Amino acid sequence: MKISLKTDIGQKRSNNQDFINKFDNKKGITLVILADGMGGHRAGNIASEMTVTDLGREWVKTDFTELSQIRDWLFETIQSENQRIYDLGQSEDFKGMGTTVEAVALVESSAIYAHIGDSRIGLVHDGHYTLLTSDHSLVNELVKAGQITEEEAASHPQRNIITQSIGQASPVEPDLGVRVLEPGDYLVINSDGLTNMISNDEIVTILGSKVSLDEKNQEMIDLANLRGGLDNITIALVHNESEDVE
């Protein structure tokens, strides 16, 4: 598995409230964590960096290799982090702080993931993009209820309101899933600063180009910025290389 991580402030924001990193546990299992923070002042930066760093610090202590162990760990650790961020958010300096989180553990050819908020995890297989997560957002609830279309959701005035985040008062309910990555498959883990700017078809086209994984990642960021870069842009690309690739 090859991994590329990149983050960019974009064209319109004065600071970067996204944070991304990867960590290996004692058995060499990699956990990629992406968070998109929210909250005034520097609260969003702190919420995202703290969530990624806290989860990573706990992950490196583990020696899990079984998917069931990792699944339970993700659920419990994200619950604990929600409480920690909520408690910090009660102080005046950090009022309203919160963050999305995508946490993806790579076990041989499988990816097991946890999802909170409106960042996304997608799979590109045989030239097709499949969204593995469902946005925890007001507009997605309206789409699922049949009240608005996906096209209307893209320009809806309340499209930035999310229905679950790390730092909320009530316990979070992370969506958990597992996916086998076949040779040649890509995972695309990203903040909404990417998917609000470029289409899934454009993601597929860029991934099909004959350049390095880091260059593909940078091409996506450059295109999102070319379109206006209205938000911070953060991407993790995971490539299960074909067996014939050295």
Curated annotation (Swiss-Prot):
Keyword Lipoprotein: no
Residues holding Mn(2+) 1: 36-37
Highest taxon in the source lineage: Bacteria
Keyword Ribosomal protein: no
Keywords: Hydrolase, Magnesium, Manganese, Metal-binding, Protein phosphatase
EC number per UniProt: 3.1.3.16
Name this protein carries in UniProt: Putative protein phosphatase 2C-type
UniProt remark on cofactor binding: Binds 2 magnesium or manganese ions per subunit.
PROSITE patterns: PPM_2
Top-tier EC class: hydrolase
Alphabetized InterPro entries for the sequence: PP2C, PPM-type-like_dom_sf, PPM-type_phosphatase-like_dom
Required cofactor names: Mg(2+); Mn(2+)
Catalytic activity: O-phospho-L-seryl-[protein] + H2O = L-seryl-[protein] + phosphate; O-phospho-L-threonyl-[protein] + H2O = L-threonyl-[protein] + phosphate
